[in-house]
Amino acid sequence: MIKNFLLSLSFISRLPLNINVNDFDRRVKKLPSFFPLVGYIVGSIYYLGALSNNLALKVFFLVLAFYFFDLFHFDGFLDTLDGFLNQSTKEKRLEIMSKGDVGPFAVFFGTLFVVVFWNLYLNANPFYFFISSTFGRYSMVLLMAFSKPAKKEGLGALFFPFEKKNLLISTIFTFFLIIFFKQYIISLTVTLITTYLISKIATSKIGGVTGDVLGGTCLFVNGLILLILEVV
C-alpha cells in the first residue's frame, strides 16, 4: 500500500521519487485510489503559504506547490482549453492537444485562472486550499469512472480499464474532511457535477479523456471549489 501511494505521488507530481517495481502495469491501475492523499500534501503547502503574512513566504510556498504539483496540470488545462474550444474535428482537437502549442484560448483563460487563483491565495480562508486540493485530485478519479479513454496510448489510457474499487477507496480518503461538514458537502457536490459535465463534454469533443483532460479537470475543480467556498 505504501509503495502504491509513493508511486501515485511520483506519477502526479514532479517529486524526484525513484520507485522501482517489477509489476508497474498492474500497479498503475491502482494508483488513482491514492490521488486524494496526494491532494492533502499539496493542500498543506498552499495552506502554509496562505496562512503566512509574509509576502516572500507566500510566494515561496506558492512556487513550491505549483512547481512540484500543479504545473503540469496547468499545462493540461491549457491544452484542453485550446482543444475543446477549437471548432474542428475530434482528430484535429486531439492533434492540437498533443502538440502543446499555446493558443489564444489558453492564453486568455490561463491568465484569468492565475489572476483569480492569486487573489484567492491572498484573501481566502487558508483551509479552503486544503479542501480544494484534495477534491481536485479526487475529481480525476471521478472523471475516470465517468469516462473512457480518447486514445489507446498516452498517460490517460494507462488507467483504463478503470478499476471501480479505486473510486470507493479514494472516496473514503476524502472522509478526513467530513468534520468540516458544510464545506465537505459543497465541495463534493461541486466535484460531482463539474466532473460529470466535463466527462460529457470530453466525450463529445474528443471521444473520451486524455491525460491533459484529467490534469486540466484537477486544476479547474480545484479553482472552482476555492471560489465557491469563498463566496458562499
UniProtKB/Swiss-Prot annotation:
Organism of derivation: Thermosipho africanus (strain TCF52B)
Name recorded for this polypeptide: Adenosylcobinamide-GDP ribazoletransferase
Cellular component, GO, one term: plasma membrane
Catalytic activity, as annotated: alpha-ribazole + adenosylcob(III)inamide-GDP = adenosylcob(III)alamin + GMP + H(+); alpha-ribazole 5'-phosphate + adenosylcob(III)inamide-GDP = adenosylcob(III)alamin 5'-phosphate + GMP + H(+)
Top-rank EC class of the record's enzyme: transferase
Coiled-coil parts of chain: none
Record-listed E.C. numbers: 2.7.8.26
Cofactor dependency: Mg(2+)
